[in-house]
Amino acid sequence: MRKFTLNIFTLSLGLAVMPMVEAAPTAQQQLLEQVRLGEATHREDLVQQSLYRLELIDPNNPDVVAARFRSLLRQGDIDGAQKQLDRLSQLAPSSNAYKSSRTTMLLSTPDGRQALQQARLQATTGHAEEAVASYNKLFNGAPPEGDIAVEYWSTVAKIPARRGEAINQLKRINADAPGNTGLQNNLALLLFSSDRRDEGFAVLEQMAKSNAGREGASKIWYGQIKDMPVSDASVSALKKYLSIFSDGDSVAAAQSQLAEQQKQLADPAFRARAQGLAAVDSGMAGKAIPELQQAVRANPKDSEALGALGQAYSQKGDRANAVANLEKALALDPHSSNNDKWNSLLKVNRYWLAIQQGDAALKANNPDRAERLFQQARNVDNTDSYAVLGLGDVAMARKDYPAAERYYQQTLRMDSGNTNAVRGLANIYRQQSPEKAEAFIASLSASQRRSIDDIERSLQNDRLAQQAEALENQGKWAQAAALQRQRLALDPGSVWITYRLSQDLWQAGQRSQADTLMRNLAQQKSNDPEQVYAYGLYLSGHDQDRAALAHINSLPRAQWNSNIQELVNRLQSDQVLETANRLRESGKEAEAEAMLRQQPPSTRIDLTLADWAQQRRDYTAARAAYQNVLTREPANADAILGLTEVDIAAGDKAAARSQLAKLPATDNASLNTQRRVALAQAQLGDTAAAQRTFNKLIPQAKSQPPSMESAMVLRDGAKFEAQAGDPTQALETYKDAMVASGVTTTRPQDNDTFTRLTRNDEKDDWLKRGVRSDAADLYRQQDLNVTLEHDYWGSSGTGGYSDLKAHTTMLQVDAPYSDGRMFFRSDFVNMNVGSFSTNADGKWDDNWGTCTLQDCSGNRSQSDSGASVAVGWRNDVWSWDIGTTPMGFNVVDVVGGISYSDDIGPLGYTVNAHRRPISSSLLAFGGQKDSPSNTGKKWGGVRADGVGLSLSYDKGEANGVWASLSGDQLTGKNVEDNWRVRWMTGYYYKVINQNNRRVTIGLNNMIWHYDKDLSGYSLGQGGYYSPQEYLSFAIPVMWRERTENWSWELGASGSWSHSRTKTMPRYPLMNLIPTDWQEEAARQSNDGGSSQGFGYTARALLERRVTSNWFVGTAIDIQQAKDYAPSHFLLYVRYSAAGWQGDMDLPPQPLIPYADW
């Protein structure tokens, strides 16, 4: 372990010192540098000494062999040089050393020397590109080292496009082989000519260190500084020069010049003049102007200072002052050597002064003056394009687009790089059509297109915006969002593109991403009123009014614009109305109205009050509120339509038509207004007019982005289509309504998807909830269903007449018809009441038939079976059916019923008339036949003919009440007539009241009265429970729930009941009794009495969706009460032809035996 630690330390130390080791030059590198130095300075002794040592240290180094090769070649030893070249080819055939040496060897041949001479001739005659091509051909891509390399790159430097490359190569050669004065001389001149003065002086300073180059460096250096204008900079430059060079003619001249300049600069006026002139030459107008102004003040007739001042103003862009000073300079010294320069500058500044003044006039909306100035500029210089451009801008200001187009085109012919002309033409063509503008832009060069990149982006943005809007109208939100992203890339940070993108993402279901985009925008542009307004709209549009107001209030009120103020007013009004609506929904409508009436007069509030009055059928108050609106706004469509709807509700169709006719004719009516018109037309019976309105309105709503308005149009349009007899089209319209209301972002394409979307959602608003519910109701109304069910039930009793075991097999087919559903029903019923117990003689004397008068004998077992059929139809208002009791029973009758349902506000009611069988026993339901040993007569088959009224009150809140009152005449074959009145009522409280789960507890009460007690089974009796007094109270508890594919109900109740019966004759119809037995029959009776006690019920019902088309279910219930204890068990299967993936029924809805309707 210790050894390992030491090794790690050693390795770390080695790695740490490695860079320092590599940084230090090796002996070989130092000797090779001495070789190159000796070659550059033509010191062969230094070359030989270095090569001798190198060949001892590293004889096979390609660079060493190449150096020996060059040495031999310089000595004229061609054979020796060739041997070294051959050796180098073996050592490093791919090295630069070998390639360079091979080229050098070639140059020693006659052909090589001739080719080199030709290249040099081309270079000296000014054919630099041809010379470089010849060099490249000769060198084959590998220039030799030394003077030939300097010669090659000096020639390359004569090609302007490659000058920088050549300078860098010459600097490299100078660094590798310092001391080549010819190279340094040439390199310095190239650097100065390329305005790389500091680098040039650095080369000269290097050159001055050698005796061979010092004099040349001094001359070049002095030549670069001697003509500098007198200034501190020129003095500094001379001092720097004299610090490096100490002798020679240039030094003497520099010393004299330095003394003179120092003397001149001691004069403040001269110093200011000199510094100003120097600053002008350096392009430093800001520094030059105050210096030259001082000089001119000292000598107002100094034409050179005036001219320089004019030049300085020109550099600064101050055309007016430039013109004034240049004119003075020319007037003072018409023959100055600077006149040509001053005249040129004067012309330029007069031209641009006129252009500037023309632009200013155009900006001041004075096109006539602008035109004169641009024309004046054109007269000064008719070769420049900007005067013509200005005339084009004047034509644009006058909206003379043909003239503007001509001027801009002329501008481009004069100067294809004039981007303003390109922009002007692009704007003209954009006004004509986007396509023409895009075609023009496509014809431009790359540089011209770059100059109007913003216009091209804007055109692309407009095109993408149109495409996105088309996709939004089709409900293709994700695709629209992709285009909005492209728009945002063209215009990053755009408030309204970000808003549109966020809206599309929200509609596409990507709500988190949409929220993030808007939040980021708010952070980036926190003080931008447009951002605040857009984010406020976004939040309020997604039911976040309070958040919208909070965001708006983060902006100082002084920065609010009219849009923000209008939005705030609307949101505050919404909050007031929201509070009022909550009060109203909680049953405090009077308080809600009082609160609204305390608000400032508002059309919106008056319309709300009118709507509330209309809903509670207070038509007088509704009319008054609508009239208040019309007093302020006589053409208010909402108020006119409101009065129309009030008149329709009041049944005054003539007044309604009169109101509808007052509606202002306009092509700009909102979708909601048109929807209400169509509904009014339909309610007035103008079906054709309503059809035309909806036919025009529905396509408009489909083309709109999702909104409450378009969703309501499509919802009501679908209802109208269904009512008009086109339910198939109505279902298609409901699919569009789902998209418009935000139920889904994609229109459903199949029944499973469509019906799955009808499932309730706790997060839905009232509109989504209504669209789902209405679509589900119509779909199920149009579906074909087949249900097969088997029900077993029974109750214990006496064998032969009341020990009942019953089986009912039901088959029902439901199909759409008109606006309701028709059905066909068949029940196969088997009832078995057991067998009589016999005495030793095989007879029985039970209280059945006439057995108490004469012992009966014969068939002990009592049962019967038969099949009933029925047809019927029902919708939301009417329901009727007609059918039979089971055919095959002893007594068969036609039965049925009819009912009508409606509501009065929150109170629902149903009235009905009916003829129904009493099915609680075989005797009451199907009749029995007295023993053949006695009378053999049939009796029973009791039917209830009567009417009923049912009431219910349930506003969807926690409490509900129901009640039922009915009266019936009870008759049967050979049964004493009877009648009954029944009252039932109940209250329930919803402990849990959710869409898919409900738990209730309640209190029920029943009061029954039968005229006679005919519960016996003797001949003439009815065999049905018929107390003269019956009172019961029950406390039911119910749990109902559904999931995606299950639905169930579990219920139980505890009850207390009291009943009383009168003593009744056992044989109430003496005409049925043989004469010999009548005396005994008259003496017999069924004793009356009273009883009371407790009971219970338990019920479980379960249904499962197996597939979209198949459903199965089962149920069981157990009842135990005084004098009544039936129990049931059933199984059923239901088939849906169209398939159903919507909500499961809650609770499940098995078939009810037709006899129990």
Curated annotation (Swiss-Prot):
The keyword Signal applies. GO terms for cellular component: cell outer membrane. TPR repeats lie at residues 62-95, 112-145, 269-302, 303-336, 351-384, 385-418, 461-494, 603-636, 710-744. One of its GO terms (biological process) is cellulose biosynthetic process. Pathway: Glycan metabolism; bacterial cellulose biosynthesis. Pfam families: BCSC_C, TPR_16, TPR_19. Keywords: Cellulose biosynthesis, Repeat, Signal, TPR repeat. Residues 1-23 form the signal peptide. The genes bscA, bcsB, bcsZ and bcsC are constitutively transcribed but cellulose synthesis occurs only when DgcC, a putative transmembrane protein regulated by CsgD, is expressed. Cellulose production is abolished in E.coli K12. Belongs to the AcsC/BcsC family. This is Cellulose synthase operon protein C. It comes from Escherichia coli (strain K12).
